[in-house]
Amino acid sequence: MANKKVTFREDVKSPAIRKLKQKLTPLKIKKGRGKIQKHIQKTLQKMKEEEESENQSPGTTVEETLTEENISTDKEETSKLENKPKKTRKTSGETIAQKKSRETVGVEVLKTSEGSSKMLGFHVSAAGGLEQAIYNARAEGCRSFAMFVRNQRTWNHKPMSEEVVENWWKAVRETNFPLDQIVPHGSYLMNAGSPEAEKLEKSRLAMLDECQRAEKLGITMYNFHPGSTVGKCEKEECMTTIAETIDFVVEKTENIILVLETMAGQGNSIGGTFEELKFIIDKVKVKSRVGVCIDTCHIFAGGYDIRTQKAYEEVMKNFGEVVGWNYLKAIHINDSKGDVGSKLDRHEHIGQGKIGKAAFELLMNDNRLDGIPMILETPEGKYPEEMMIMYNMDKR
């Protein structure tokens, strides 16, 4: 019988997959064993998808992730979000020289941060195991960081193994990283305010699972996008449902705080105003288990101008009066490609967008923000450099 050579997709970039590819390509598989070839191809595709998901950061949306439920029914808005360039820095497959270079930069970041009470970080990769997120964060000079506690592009997951938990706690002991400075990001598949019963149930169970995983890791906060009406219900109904989702998770967890993220007001999304977040908080039964994360790009695009000291103080005063400073648990640090009030959720490097450096200098010198996780979600490639820029803005 004729032999058949195994073929591979050319777009497979993962070092791990390339290594497996090199081992398997020379194999000759008989036609009668076609099932083996299919199994190999399926395994390779699964590995590729898992690695892509582990290295995807907030805002790095892809077609499989975006649904009408979790963003909006507005095709133009969905297109904007699909094209976001933000990705977490990849560290898998790096050479020893690259690793040393990365760690050297991390040391410089920590030196620059000396004397500052601000806790800067970014969304880090957990490729290779959740504990790698801690090692990566420490290596690059993070004082705080965001991550995904599971593959955020699929609904179904295996339970978290004891080995995963043990490896995580080993990394915590070795790095002494403060667990209250880790703010995992919820899956984009979820819509905590969905008007459709089936999607709502799946979202609630997914959020509960992610929060229970976070608690096993000693993490105290969980950040998520509030939700969307998807054009099928009134905002008040959607916000009430979001509060009920929070209550559902709180009742089945011990102490994790569910942190609502401010949104840009795009499409049918909830969270574009401080008043909407306040409405949700007022409906939540246990107030100590809910909080807010201010995203600088989102509030700016939503109409909150923070570019001058006067404007900044007015916005912060408004937040304190409407929501309350006691609910502020984290900040996402991003410049904006869109202008104030544009409702365009597109992040930009610090000082290179429409917000400008002045606003971030005000943030870095605001005593009310000391000790709060401040997480960069700017486009990939400059996180350590941007953290040093930010720390140098702290003049206190």
From Swiss-Prot:
GO BP terms in the entry: base-excision repair
EC number(s) on file: 3.1.21.-
SUPFAM superfamilies from the UniProt entry: Xylose isomerase-like
Positions of Zn(2+) 1 binding: H185, H225, E261
GO molecular function annotations of the record: 3'-tyrosyl-DNA phosphodiesterase activity; DNA binding; DNA-(apurinic or apyrimidinic site) endonuclease activity; double-stranded DNA 3'-5' DNA exonuclease activity; phosphoric diester hydrolase activity; zinc ion binding
Residues that, per the record, bind Zn(2+) 3: H298, D345, H347
InterPro entries assigned: AP_endonuc_2, AP_endonuc_F2_Zn_BS, Xyl_isomerase-like_sf, Xyl_isomerase-like_TIM-brl
Binding note for cofactor: Binds 3 Zn(2+) ions.
Segments of this protein annotated with the region Disordered: 31-100
Compartmental location: Nucleus
Keyword field: DNA damage, DNA repair, Hydrolase, Metal-binding, Nucleus, Zinc
GO cellular component term, pick one: nucleus
Residue stretches of biased makeup (Basic residues): 31-41
Ranges of biased composition (kind: Polar residues): 55-70
Compositional bias segments (type: Basic and acidic residues): 72-85
Record carries keyword Metal-binding: yes
Names of the cofactor(s): Zn(2+)
Keyword Hydrolase carried by entry: yes
Gene3D superfamilies, alphabetized: Divalent-metal-dependent TIM barrel enzymes
Chain positions recorded as Zn(2+) 2 binding sites: E261, D295, H332, E377
UniProt similarity note: Belongs to the AP endonuclease 2 family.
NCBIfam families hit by this protein: nfo, PRK01060.1-4
Name this protein carries in UniProt: Apurinic-apyrimidinic endonuclease
Source organism of this protein record: Caenorhabditis elegans
Gene: apn-1
